[in-house]
């Protein structure tokens, strides 16, 4: 008999800018998204701040980074740094 293994989906990923790197092995990124107002239909920006696990303290303030979700690492951290897309100037 052949057993079938359920296929899991891909993990979510976000791209954002580092706004704080003052913690050890962690940083905070801001992810912007465009949302449409339900009544007036105008688009506006909303910002979400994510706390990210940065094992080697690679990211600095102003860097553009890509993060992926992972298991909860602490009360507020459930993402880890995947790559630094662009370093700050």
UniProtKB/Swiss-Prot annotation:
Protein's UniProt name: Small ribosomal subunit protein uS17
Listed GO biological process terms: translation
Keyword RNA-binding belongs to the record: yes
UniProt keyword terms in alphabetical order: Ribonucleoprotein, Ribosomal protein, RNA-binding, rRNA-binding
Record SUPFAM superfamilies: Nucleic acid-binding proteins (SSF50249)
Oligomer and partners: Part of the 30S ribosomal subunit.
The organism of origin for this protein: Chlorobium chlorochromatii (strain CaD3)
NCBIfam families per UniProt: PRK05610.1, uS17_bact
Coiled coil: none
Job description of the protein: One of the primary rRNA binding proteins, it binds specifically to the 5'-end of 16S ribosomal RNA.
HAMAP family xrefs: Ribosomal_uS17_B
Stated family: Belongs to the universal ribosomal protein uS17 family.
One annotated GO molecular function: rRNA binding
């Amino acid at each position: 008999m052949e057993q079938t293994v359920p296929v899991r989906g891909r993990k979510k990923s976000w791209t954002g800018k580092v706004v704080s790197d003052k913690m050890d092995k962690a940083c905070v990124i801001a992810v912007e998204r465009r949302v449409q107002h339900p009544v007036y239909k105008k688009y506006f920006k909303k910002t979400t701040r994510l706390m990210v696990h940065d094992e080697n303290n690679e990211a600095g303030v102003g860097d553009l980074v890509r993060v992926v979700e992972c298991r909860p690492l602490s009360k507020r951290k459930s993402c880890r740094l995947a790559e630094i897309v662009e370093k700050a100037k």
